[in-house]
C-alpha cells in the first residue's frame, strides 16, 4: 500500500487515513444509543474500565509464560484523565493493546453475537446498563461522547488511532503522536451537556459504585491549584515563564501590554532594592489518587462483609444491573488451600446454552494474581451460570491450559465447588419464593446435571420441582410426591409432553387419576433426557405412563376381570394387528384407559412420543437411530369403550367385513395424534375424515361438485372399504 512507503515527515497524513463503514447492526445500535434518552449514562465508565481490566488480564496472562511481553511496560494500571479545557475524558490502560486488524474488526466491522440480542432487549424495555453482558460495552461511550478517539499499541504492531463521531463510519490511521509503549487510550470528546463526567467528585462516585473491585490500580489525574509562598525573584521567574507562554498564544496586538508589565516590574525592583519579600502565587499541579485500594473481598472474613458489599462486588464482577439471588463465600484449608466466592444471578443470560459461549464465568486467581476467566475444568457445564472467583494458594502462577487439564489440584477444587454449589441450592430451596425464582431460570441446568453428573445425581434430584395431577398451580418436589403416595403404590408415575394442559388431558392419565394416583407432569424437552438417567428416587422406580407394561395397584378381583377382558378381546387384537401389520409391534387390551377408545404406547426402552418429536426436530439427527428407536409402538384398546365393543362385534360377525379395516386404520391414526405422535401421511388421514363427514351429512359420495378441482381431490381420496353399508358406519359412531 502506498501509505506504508511514506515516511513520517512527509505531510501526507490524509492519504494514510482509511475510512470504514460500521457493520449494519453496529450502526443501528449506535443510533439507538445516541438518539434515545437514558438516565443512567454513567455506566459508560464502568464498561470502559471493564474493557481495560480485560486487556490487562490478557497481557498479564501472556507474560506468565513469556515475561518479555512486559518489556514494553512493566506496570499494569488504568489511568483516568479529565481535561476541562478540551472537554475530554481519557481512559488509559497498559493492557495488551490492539493491532490494526483488531481495531477494524472489534470496533466496527464485525458484530458480536450479542449486538442484535441487546438491541431487541433494549427495544423491549431492558436497561441500558445490561450492555456489558452482550459484549458491546465499548459503544456505551456514545452515551456521553460526540466523538471517540482510540489510540492503541500492541506488541506485534505499530501505534494506531481509531476515530468516529458515530456517523455510520470510522477512520483508522497510523498514530505519530507520543509513543505509548503498549496499551490503549480511549479519548472521549464529551457532549456539551455531559461535562459532569469531568468533575473529580462524579468520577470518584462512579468508580466507587461500579469498579472499586477491579484488580488493577485505577488512578485519577486531576489538575489542581494551590497557594505557594515564594520570594519575589522566584515569583518573577514564574511570571516571566507565564508571560512567555502568553506571548506564544496571543496575537501581535497583545505585545505592548506584556512589555508594560515588564517595565513596571523593573521599577518595583528599583524601589525595593535589595529587600526580599515573600509572595503567594497560585501553582498548578497534577494530583494523582488511586480510587480502588479495597482489599480483594474474597480474602476477607465473611462475617465482616455486608450484603451491600457483596452486591457491589457482584455487580462489578458481572456487569449485571440487578442484585445477585444468593452467595456462597468459603475457604478450604488443609492439604489444599483455596478461597472462593460464588454467586447465583437473578436471571439466566440470554445465551446460556450457546456452544460458542465460554463454558463458565468463574475467574481463576493464583495467590491474588488473575490467571483466566474461561477455565473449562473449573466447574461442570451445567453450573455455567454460577459467577464468582476462585483463588488458589497451590497452583503455579505460570500454569498453562494443558497443565490445568491434568492438574489434580484443579480436580479437587472442582469437586469442592460443585459440592458448595449444591449446598447453596439446598439452602435456597428452604425459601420457597426465592427458590421459585431460581428454578424458573435454572431448572434446565439442574436437569442437565442429572443427565451428566452421576456422582451428584441423588442430591440434584432433590432439587427438582414439577407440576403434578394433584398439585394445581404449585410445583412440588419428588420428596413431596413420595409422602403422598398410596399405601400399595410401588412406583412414581410421570408423563412427558409439551404443555401442562396437554398432558393433563392425555388418555394415559385417565385411569391413574380415577384411582387417585398422582402423576408428575414433565413438560420441558430436557426432562426426557433427565429421566433416562434418573431411574429411581428414594427406592421408588420412576415409571412412564406412556410406555408398555404399566402396573397399577390392583386387588385380586380387578386382576381377574382384566384377564377375562383380555380373553374376550383376544381375537379383535389379532385382527387389528393383521390389518396394521408393521405399523405396530402388538395390539393389547389396556388397563390405563377410561374414556378414550385406544392409545399408542411405546416399548419400555423405546422413545416416548415426546422424545420422538424432539429427535425429529434435531437438525443433525441420525436417521438409522430414528428408525430403530421410533418403531416400537403398541396399540392398546379400551375394552369398556362402545367403539371397541361394537368393532369386536362387527369383526366376529364377519371377519372379512371391509369396513373393519378402514375403521381400524382410522382408529390407529387418531390414536397416534391423541398420543402425541405425528402422522407420516396427514393428507390421507384428512381425506378419510372428510369421507366420514360426508357420510355423516348424508351426502352421496358420487354427487358432482360445483368446483372441478374439488372433484379431482375427491377422486384421489382413499375409498372407504364396505361403504355401501352406511348404516353400519353410523352405528359405530
From Swiss-Prot:
Post-translational modification note: ISGylated.
Location in the cell: Nucleus; Cytoplasm; Melanosome; Cell membrane
Residues covered by region (Required for homodimerization): 683-733
UniProt keyword terms in alphabetical order: Acetylation, ATP-binding, Cell membrane, Chaperone, Cytoplasm, Hydrolase, Membrane, Mitochondrion, Nucleotide-binding, Nucleus, Phosphoprotein, S-nitrosylation, Stress response, Ubl conjugation
Regulation: In the resting state, through the dimerization of its C-terminal domain, HSP90 forms a homodimer which is defined as the open conformation. Upon ATP-binding, the N-terminal domain undergoes significant conformational changes and comes in contact to form an active closed conformation. After HSP90 finishes its chaperoning tasks of assisting the proper folding, stabilization and activation of client proteins under the active state, ATP molecule is hydrolyzed to ADP which then dissociates from HSP90 and directs the protein back to the resting state.
Gene3D superfamilies: 3.30.230.80, 3.40.50.11260, Heat shock protein 90, C-terminal domain (1.20.120.790), Histidine kinase-like ATPase, C-terminal domain (3.30.565.10)
Transmembrane segments: none
Function of the molecule: Molecular chaperone that promotes the maturation, structural maintenance and proper regulation of specific target proteins involved for instance in cell cycle control and signal transduction. Undergoes a functional cycle that is linked to its ATPase activity which is essential for its chaperone activity. This cycle probably induces conformational changes in the client proteins, thereby causing their activation. Interacts dynamically with various co-chaperones that modulate its substrate recognition, ATPase cycle and chaperone function.
Protein name in the entry: Heat shock protein HSP 90-alpha
Organism for this UniProt entry: Sus scrofa (Pig)
Amino acid at each position: 500500500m502506498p501509505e506504508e512507503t511514506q515516511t513520517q515527515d512527509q505531510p501526507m497524513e490524509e492519504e494514510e487515513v482509511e475510512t470504514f463503514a460500521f457493520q449494519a447492526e453496529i450502526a443501528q445500535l449506535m443510533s439507538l444509543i445516541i438518539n434515545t434518552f437514558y438516565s443512567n449514562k454513567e455506566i459508560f465508565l464502568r464498561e470502559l474500565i471493564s474493557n481495560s481490566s480485560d486487556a490487562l488480564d490478557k497481557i498479564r496472562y501472556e507474560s506468565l509464560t513469556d515475561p518479555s511481553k512486559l518489556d514494553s511496560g512493566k506496570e499494569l494500571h488504568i489511568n483516568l484523565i479529565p481535561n476541562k479545557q478540551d472537554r475530554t475524558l481519557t481512559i488509559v490502560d497498559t493492557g495488551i493493546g490492539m493491532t490494526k486488524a483488531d481495531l477494524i474488526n472489534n470496533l466496527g466491522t464485525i458484530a458480536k453475537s450479542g449486538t442484535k440480542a441487546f438491541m431487541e432487549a433494549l427495544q423491549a424495555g431492558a436497561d441500558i446498563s445490561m450492555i456489558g453482558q452482550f459484549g458491546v460495552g465499548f459503544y456505551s461511550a456514545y452515551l456521553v461522547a460526540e466523538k471517540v478517539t482510540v489510540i492503541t499499541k500492541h506488541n506485534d504492531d505499530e501505534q494506531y488511532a481509531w476515530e468516529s463521531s458515530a456517523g455510520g463510519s470510522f477512520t483508522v490511521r497510523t498514530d505519530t503522536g507520543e509513543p505509548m509503549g503498549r496499551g490503549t487510550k480511549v479519548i472521549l470528546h464529551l457532549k456539551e451537556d455531559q461535562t459532569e463526567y469531568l468533575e473529580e467528585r462524579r468520577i470518584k462516585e462512579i468508580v466507587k459504585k461500579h469498579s472499586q473491585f477491579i484488580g488493577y490500580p485505577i488512578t485519577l489525574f486531576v489538575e489542581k491549584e494551590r497557594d505557594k509562598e515564594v520570594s519575589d525573584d522566584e515569583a518573577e521567574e514564574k511570571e516571566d515563564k507565564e508571560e512567555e507562554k502568553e506571548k506564544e498564544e496571543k496575537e501581535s496586538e497583545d505585545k505592548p501590554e506584556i512589555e508594560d508589565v515588564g517595565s513596571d516590574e523593573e521599577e518595583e525592583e528599583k524601589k525595593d532594592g535589595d529587600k526580599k519579600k515573600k509572595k503567594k502565587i497560585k501553582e498548578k499541579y497534577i494530583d494523582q489518587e488511586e480510587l480502588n485500594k479495597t482489599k480483594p473481598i474474597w480474602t476477607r472474613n465473611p462475617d465482616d462483609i455486608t450484603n451491600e458489599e457483596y452486591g457491589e462486588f457482584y455487580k462489578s464482577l458481572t456487569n449485571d444491573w440487578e442484585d445477585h439471588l444468593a452467595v456462597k463465600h468459603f475457604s478450604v484449608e488443609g492439604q489444599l488451600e483455596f478461597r472462593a466466592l460464588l454467586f447465583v444471578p437473578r436471571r439466566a443470560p440470554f445465551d446460556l446454552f450457546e456452544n460458542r459461549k465460554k463454558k463458565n464465568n468463574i475467574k481463576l486467581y493464583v495467590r491474588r494474581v488473575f490467571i483466566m476467566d474461561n477455565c473449562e475444568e473449573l466447574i461442570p457445564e451445567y453450573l455455567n451460570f454460577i459467577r464468582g472467583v476462585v483463588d488458589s494458594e497451590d497452583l503455579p502462577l505460570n500454569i498453562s491450559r494443558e497443565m490445568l487439564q491434568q492438574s489434580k489440584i484443579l480436580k479437587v477444587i472442582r469437586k469442592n465447588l460443585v459440592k458448595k454449589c449444591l449446598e447453596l441450592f439446598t439452602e435456597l430451596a428452604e425459601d420457597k419464593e426465592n427458590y421459585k425464582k431460581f428454578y424458573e431460570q435454572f431448572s434446565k441446568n439442574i436437569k442437565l446435571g442429572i443427565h451428566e453428573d452421576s456422582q451428584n445425581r441423588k442430591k440434584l434430584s432433590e432439587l427438582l420441582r414439577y407440576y403434578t395431577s394433584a398439585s394445581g398451580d404449585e410445583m412440588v418436589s419428588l420428596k413431596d410426591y413420595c409422602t403422598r403416595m398410596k399405601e400399595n403404590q410401588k412406583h412414581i408415575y410421570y408423563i412427558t409432553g409439551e404443555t401442562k394442559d396437554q398432558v393433563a388431558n392425555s388418555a394415559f392419565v385417565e385411569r391413574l387419576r380415577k384411582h387417585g394416583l398422582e402423576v408428575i407432569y414433565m413438560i420441558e424437552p430436557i426432562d426426557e433426557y433427565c429421566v433416562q438417567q434418573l431411574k429411581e428416587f428414594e427406592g421408588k422406580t420412576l415409571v412412564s405412563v406412556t410406555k408398555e407394561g404399566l402396573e397399577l395397584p390392583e386387588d385380586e378381583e380387578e386382576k381377574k376381570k382384566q384377564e377375562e377382558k383380555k380373553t374376550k378381546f383376544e381375537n379383535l387384537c389379532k385382527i387389528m394387528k393383521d390389518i396394521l401389520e408393521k405399523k405396530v409391534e402388538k395390539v393389547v387390551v389396556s388397563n390405563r384407559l377410561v374414556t378414550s377408545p385406544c392409545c399408542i404406547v411405546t416399548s419400555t426402552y423405546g422413545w416416548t412420543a415426546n422424545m420422538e418429536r424432539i429427535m425429529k426436530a434435531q437438525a443433525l439427527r441420525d436417521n438409522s437411530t430414528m428408525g430403530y428407536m421410533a418403531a416400537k409402538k403398541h396399540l392398546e384398546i379400551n375394552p369398556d369403550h362402545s367403539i371397541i365393543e361394537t368393532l369386536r362385534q362387527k369383526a366376529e360377525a364377519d371377519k372379512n367385513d371391509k369396513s373393519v379395516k378402514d375403521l381400524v386404520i382410522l382408529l390407529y391414526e387418531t390414536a397416534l395424534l391423541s398420543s402425541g405422535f405425528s402422522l407420516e401421511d396427514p393428507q390421507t388421514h384428512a381425506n378419510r375424515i372428510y369421507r366420514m363427514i360426508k357420510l355423516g351429512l348424508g351426502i352421496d359420495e358420487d354427487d358432482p361438485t360445483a368446483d372441478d378441482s374439488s372433484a379431482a381431490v375427491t377422486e384421489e381420496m382413499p375409498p372407504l372399504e364396505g361403504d355401501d353399508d352406511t348404516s353400519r358406519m353410523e352405528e359405530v359412531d
